[in-house]
Amino acid sequence: MAMVIRKTTQIGNKVIRAKAVPVLNVRSKATAKIIQDLTDSMRHHGLVGMAGPQIGKGVRIFVTEIRYNKSRKDRKLSDLDPLRIFINPCLISASRRQVKDWEGCGSVAYAGLFGSVKRPASVGVEAYDENGIKFALKASNLLARVIQHEMDHLNGIVFVDKAD
């Protein structure tokens, strides 16, 4: 499949504020195309996660990948995480312990905004992968934050709604 870099849909576009719809055919060519476009675009824009609405697709899919970036002094080696695909994800648990940390977003990039957001330190999530196989994942630290941030996108929420 040819690499396609999508512009990141910005806040103000109605798809960013709409609740994304479930994917009905997880293994379709259309779903595979969305996953590939999300992955290529996330990597191109230097993001650690990207959700369907961020490329104008109002479907419940997001991808994450925490790669090494020498310009990011705050990223620990323990935070690195391979590419993960989440289709029709559902948060199934969240820790009581909350952690405040800085977030940014490709969908508010024009404003260069960052904000401090309090989120559970760890979460459990269930989703389907690109092969239609259901999986459960317990995430903590940066991956937990990225998952929650991307889940918010699927529900029409942007981090600035939660920032202090």
Q: What is each model feature region?
A:
Residues 1-148, 153-164:
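Active-site rim/adjacent substrate-binding subdomains
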